[in-house]
């Protein structure tokens, strides 16, 4: 058959498939802009700032609406009420993970971030239990974070109060905490193996944040037939998995079943207990991918939040002064901060919360999916439909947070200066898919920041009023603009 005829037939089939998918069930789905064949609503979305586009569309179609990214149908949730109703009140029905062709290629359905069903539930339950087990290797997770915080302070001392970009050092600290939990080992910041790991993690975040990856996920045929950065992403992930597998083999040879040292040991012990169960989800494949998931999810998000926190503290020296006064009063100079201190430091706690609220790190979270046909607000959402959640619409709700575009710790303080919780605080998402490392991340943010401010004054290279804190939105995360500062020993 003539190649031209084959091409026309293929394009015609794709067009018909697109029209059929977009028209099927439209009477039951939430409203939304009319999609174009094949490309859907992509032309109506700013790929570099999806969150802003969703906010604009919500003003037209309401808090629940339908979009098509290519052939992929998505239902968008915008605003606290619908997000709570879906992710919390109907948590089980909305607990699936959205379709990610690239991740599915890399992870093969294993791990904790992109798995679904029984596998996801069992691996998540085990990971939560293990991360909360403060007795691994007779050292609590808090001990590990405190140790890394001391190392971080010593690295900052080496800058000798000269101007520096904190990106690298602030990236090393949370990565080392995860390494300590998974591998029972922290690395020197100049260790070549550690630097290679950091390089792969950072490069992957840069790649994932590009519009090209959005295109690959919406048109998965590209993955096999086109060159691009997605190939580098898959190569980096394969490198990390190979490295983790080597460490798993080392653990198998040296493990003491009665004295687990780290996450890998705990997983291997669980595998041993379930070795007679042919349906067990505790396999080497799941261990390797879960460890890679924890490394990827637990490094860049925390380091970016820390980097943004220091920029905001530079911009608002009056806030920094209040935090340091609270540190001096509650902790002093002669001991290290600990998590028990947080309950006695409402202002510092409010500042950490406000940093996370203000920066809105992951504006749309990772997409969910419905696990069955769901009736939601008089609409029928078919099983498997991807759910896109606007966390921006919750964290920047102007009824809950007056002047949401302003950095103001009073958003989390009552009139008496006591810490005030808010149900709208969802930087880790909400419901059954809430970030498994939430507790660890909150511990790291509090301890790293208090250790830094206990030991250093922060000095800006320019007038604080002239510092730009506008986030650089890159399609996946909101990151701070480049800046330098000086760490002046107190």
UniProtKB/Swiss-Prot annotation:
GO cellular component, one term: endoplasmic reticulum membrane
Expression triggers: P450 can be induced to high levels in liver and other tissues by various foreign compounds, including drugs, pesticides, and carcinogens.
Reaction(s) the record says it catalyses: an organic molecule + reduced [NADPH--hemoprotein reductase] + O2 = an alcohol + oxidized [NADPH--hemoprotein reductase] + H2O + H(+); (5Z,8Z,11Z)-eicosatrienoate + reduced [NADPH--hemoprotein reductase] + O2 = 19-hydroxy-(5Z,8Z,11Z)-eicosatrienoate + oxidized [NADPH--hemoprotein reductase] + H2O + H(+); (5Z,8Z,11Z,14Z)-eicosatetraenoate + reduced [NADPH--hemoprotein reductase] + O2 = 19-hydroxy-(5Z,8Z,11Z,14Z)-eicosatetraenoate + oxidized [NADPH--hemoprotein reductase] + H2O + H(+); (5Z,8Z,11Z,14Z,17Z)-eicosapentaenoate + reduced [NADPH--hemoprotein reductase] + O2 = 19-hydroxy-(5Z,8Z,11Z,14Z,17Z)-eicosapentaenoate + oxidized [NADPH--hemoprotein reductase] + H2O + H(+)
Function of the molecule: A cytochrome P450 monooxygenase involved in the metabolism of polyunsaturated fatty acids (PUFA). Mechanistically, uses molecular oxygen inserting one oxygen atom into a substrate, and reducing the second into a water molecule, with two electrons provided by NADPH via cytochrome P450 reductase (NADPH--hemoprotein reductase). Catalyzes the hydroxylation of carbon-hydrogen bonds. Hydroxylates PUFA specifically at the omega-1 position. Catalyzes the epoxidation of double bonds of PUFA. Also metabolizes plant monoterpenes such as limonene.
Record annotation: effect of changing residue 150 to H: In allele CYP2C19*11
Pfam family, one: p450
The protein, known as: Cytochrome P450 2C19
Source species taxonomy: Eukaryota, Metazoa, Chordata, Craniata, Vertebrata
PROSITE patterns named among the record's database cross-references: CYTOCHROME_P450
Matches recorded under InterPro entries: Cyt_P450, Cyt_P450_CS, Cyt_P450_E_grp-I, Cyt_P450_sf, Cytochrome_P450_fam2
Effect ascribed to mutating residue 227 to L: In allele CYP2C19*10
Principal localisation: endoplasmic reticulum
GO molecular function: (R)-limonene 6-monooxygenase activity; (S)-limonene 6-monooxygenase activity; (S)-limonene 7-monooxygenase activity; enzyme binding; heme binding; iron ion binding; long-chain fatty acid omega-1 hydroxylase activity; monooxygenase activity
EC number(s) from the headed UniProt entry: 1.14.14.1, 1.14.14.53, 1.14.14.51, 1.14.14.52
Impact reported for residue 120 to R: In allele CYP2C19*8; loss of activity
Designated gene of the protein: CYP2C19
Entry keyword Heme: yes
Cell compartment(s), UniProt: Endoplasmic reticulum membrane; Microsome membrane
